[in-house]
Amino acid sequence: LYESLPVTVNNKKQNVIKKRWLQNYNKTLDKIYSSKLKEILGEFEMDNLKSETGEDFFGLFHESFAPLPLHVDTGFDENALIYKQIVTPLIEPGDTVFFKKRWYKQSTTFTNNEEELNFKPKPGQNARSKDHLGEIEFDKDMHAKYLSHIDINNLRGMEVEMIYNWKVGESLIVDRTHIHCASSRLNKRKLGLTTFTKRK
């Protein structure tokens, strides 16, 4: 499925290729995936943007060639009752690092870089913020092992809640308010599917 889908975004700055899971590219997979989500999550709606004909996308495939930075996937509709995001690894190795702090505003990338903080997002782009920062220094051993791609000062006040070690054949379901990032443990590339949901 992934290989047959058209490229949606080729972000050379983040070094990531994104493809939307369009409906009807593989109707069998569409049915299996959507019915399994309903079985696990109960009543929900997709929150992955829509096609030109108004159909929901089932998620976003992301092929990363560099670790993604500290961010949150809360979406861009302040009136939506956001629910869960589902991360499905398609290759190994890889990790997603989740932090204890939550975020309840729009999708945001967290940075202590003053130039980056002046970024003015277009519709559908992450805001920038340093409001995640606290006073306590981040654990140096944890930084060296998992987060060496992030300035340790940009992790001040943060505490790791969970490190999800990617395993093909699994899906991780978490609240969308979790601040998270990729780990620096990357073997050339990382490929996964992320699906965002909201309450009906």
Residue ranges and their predicted role:
Residues 1-59, 65-67, 102, 109-134:
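Non-heme Fe(II)/2-oxoglutarate
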Residues 63-177, 183-200:
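Catalytic core of non-heme Fe(II) oxygenases with the double-stranded beta-helix
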Residues 14, 179-180:
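Short, isolated positions in well-ordered beta-strands
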